[in-house]
C-alpha cells in the first residue's frame, strides 16, 4: 500500500491500520515510490531527457522528500503497538546501470522489503499515457521489458517484483506469443 497521499504521521498510518482491522487483515505492507526521495532523483536523468512529458511529470512529483523522513516514520511506527503487523518497504524503479547506486542507498536502512519495478524501457515511460505508444516498436519494447525483468530478478536487490504485467496496461501486445 503506497502511503504517499498523506503526511508522515501516526494518524495517517492509523488510517491504514483501521481499514486492515475492519477487513480482518493481520499484516499490512506499506511503501513509497523511490522517485519521491531526492536521493533517488539522479536515476531518472535519462528518462527525463527522453521525454518532455516525463520531465514535467517527474519534476512535479519527484524529490519532494528526503529518505531520512521516511526512515524516521518507520522508527516512530515501530516504537508503537498496533493491532496488525506493519512492514515497510520501497518500490524502486529498476535501471540496470543503477544497481550499485540502489544497493548503496538501501543497504542497512531497516526496510522489511524492497520491490523492484520496471516503468521505463530504454527510457520510454510505457505506463504513463496510451498515446505515447503511437509509432513505437511494440515487439522491441516487450522484448526489452522481459530482458529488464530478468535482469531485475537476477540482481538480487529485491524481495519481489512490483506489477510484473504493467507492460500490458494499455492493451498493446507483441506479434509473437508470450507463452
Question: What role is predicted for each listed range?
Answer:
Residues 8-19, 97-105, 144-152:
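Short, acidic/polar
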Residues 40-42, 101, 127-129:
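Short aromatic-enriched loop/helix-cap "lid" or pocket-rim segments at secondary-structure transitions
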Residues 21-22, 73-83, 102-112, 151-157:
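Acidic (Asp/Glu)-rich catalytic clusters
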Residues 92, 96, 108-111, 115-179:
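Domain-core and long-helix interface of multi-subunit machines
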Residues 1-96, 170-178:
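An N-terminally biased module of ancient metal coordination in phosphate/nucleic-acid-related enzymes
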Residues 15-18, 47-50, 105-109, 133-136:
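Short, low-complexity, polar/charged sequence segments that are solvent-exposed and flexible
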Amino acid at each position: 500500500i503506497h502511503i504517499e497521499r498523506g503526511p508522515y504521521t501516526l494518524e495517517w498510518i492509523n488510517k491504514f491500520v483501521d481499514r486492515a482491522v475492519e477487513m480482518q487483515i493481520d499484516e499490512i505492507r506499506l511503501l513509497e515510490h523511490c522517485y519521491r526521495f531526492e536521493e533517488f532523483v539522479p536515476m531518472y536523468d535519462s528518462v527525463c531527457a527522453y521525454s518532455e512529458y516525463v520531465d514535467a511529470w517527474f519534476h512535479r512529483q519527484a524529490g519532494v522528500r528526503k529518505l531520512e523522513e521516511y526512515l524516521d516514520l518507520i522508527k516512530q511506527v515501530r516504537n508503537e503497538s498496533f493491532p496488525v503487523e506493519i512492514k515497510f518497504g520501497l518500490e524502486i524503479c529498476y535501471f540496470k546501470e543503477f544497481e550499485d547506486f540502489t544497493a548503496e542507498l538501501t543497504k542497512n536502512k531497516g526496510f522489511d522489503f524492497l520491490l523492484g519495478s520496471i516503468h521505463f524501457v530504454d527510457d520510454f515511460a510505457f505506463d504513463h499515457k496510451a498515446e505515447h505508444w503511437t509509432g513505437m516498436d511494440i515487439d522491441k519494447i516487450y522484448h526489452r521489458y522481459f530482458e529488464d525483468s530478468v535482469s531485475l530478478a537476477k540482481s538480487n536487490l529485491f524481495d519481489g517484483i512490483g506489477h510484473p504485467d504493467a507492460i500490458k496496461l494499455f492493451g498493446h501486445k507483441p506479434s509473437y506469443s508470450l507463452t
